Amino acid sequence: MGQLNVLTGSKGEIR
């Protein structure tokens, strides 16, 4: 994705 995935919650991984 290349953007912050808010669905990850506290993780905030860039996918």
Swiss-Prot record:
It is an enzyme of class 1 (oxidoreductase). The keyword Oxidoreductase applies. Its cofactor is Ca(2+); heme b. It is found in: Secreted; Secreted, Cell wall. It catalyses: 2 a phenolic donor + H2O2 = 2 a phenolic radical donor + 2 H2O. GO terms for cellular component: extracellular region. Its EC number is 1.11.1.7. Keywords: Calcium, Cell wall, Heme, Hydrogen peroxide, Iron, Metal-binding, Oxidoreductase, Peroxidase, Secreted. The keyword Flavoprotein does not apply. GO terms for molecular function: lactoperoxidase activity; metal ion binding. GO terms for biological process: hydrogen peroxide catabolic process. It comes from the Eukaryota. Binds 2 calcium ions per subunit. Binds 1 heme b (iron(II)-protoporphyrin IX) group per subunit. Belongs to the peroxidase family. Classical plant (class III) peroxidase subfamily. Removal of H(2)O(2), oxidation of toxic reductants, biosynthesis and degradation of lignin, suberization, auxin catabolism, response to environmental stresses such as wounding, pathogen attack and oxidative stress. These functions might be dependent on each isozyme/isoform in each plant tissue. This is Peroxidase 3. It comes from Cycas revoluta.
